Regions:
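Non-transmembrane, low-complexity coil segments enriched in Pro/Ser/Thr that form solvent-exposed tails
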Residues: 28-120, 125-126, 150-157
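Extracytoplasmic/luminal low-complexity segments enriched in Pro/Gly and acidic/polar residues
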Residues: 123-159
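Charged, low-complexity, helix/coiled-coil-prone segments
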Residues: 1-10, 58-62, 135-149
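Juxtamembrane "stalk/linker" segments
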Residues: 1-40
Length: 159
């Protein structure tokens, strides 16, 4: 009987640990907690104000496809619902205006992310073609302090 109680207590503890781990992973994915880890810092200087929202959307997509786990742009935490609007010289992310120099902080496997950004005809190449100076720096510890404000889903519902 004592062994059964110990076993039940161990199972309850394992379930609680799994639930805490799942919650932490969900918070990181949603961008609602500060994080740190290996990754890259991408510095973009657009002195001519030639970059459009298209370049930012493309960069965000490349980062996600390369396995980025957390992304910040000019102090704004990006999430799955982030959006870019505006014209060259007047870009906004999630409704907040941003300006050059642009600093992307990205957590993930640094070499994979750096390679993805620097592929031929990729986002870094397109920004350079528009006159921007782009520097991609792999880093052993990127810190992202900003958090995204959670927004309720507009269309998705739980079944």
């Amino acid at each position: 009987e004592l062994d059964e109680l110990r076993s039940a207590a161990d199972e309850a503890q394992a379930r609680e640990q799994a639930a805490r781990k799942a919650e932490t992973q969900a918070q990181i994915a949603a961008g609602t907690v500060p994080v740190h880890g290996p990754g890259v810092t991408v510095s973009v200087v657009d002195a001519g104000a030639n970059l459009t929202s298209t370049q930012f959307v493309m960069t965000l997509g490349e980062l996600r496809n390369a396995g980025a786990e957390a992304i910040e742009l000019n102090g704004i935490r990006l999430s799955t619902r982030s959006s870019f609007t505006g014209q060259a010289g007047s870009i906004a992310v999630d409704g907040m205006p941003i300006a050059s120099p642009y600093t992307w902080k990205v957590i993930g496997e640094s070499q994979t992310i750096a390679t993805a950004l620097d592929i031929q005809a990729g986002s870094a190449a397109q920004m350079r073609a528009k006159g921007a100076n782009v520097a991609i720096t792999p880093t052993t510890d990127v810190t992202i302090e900003s958090i995204a404000s959670p927004r309720p889903p507009q269309f998705a519902t739980y079944q």
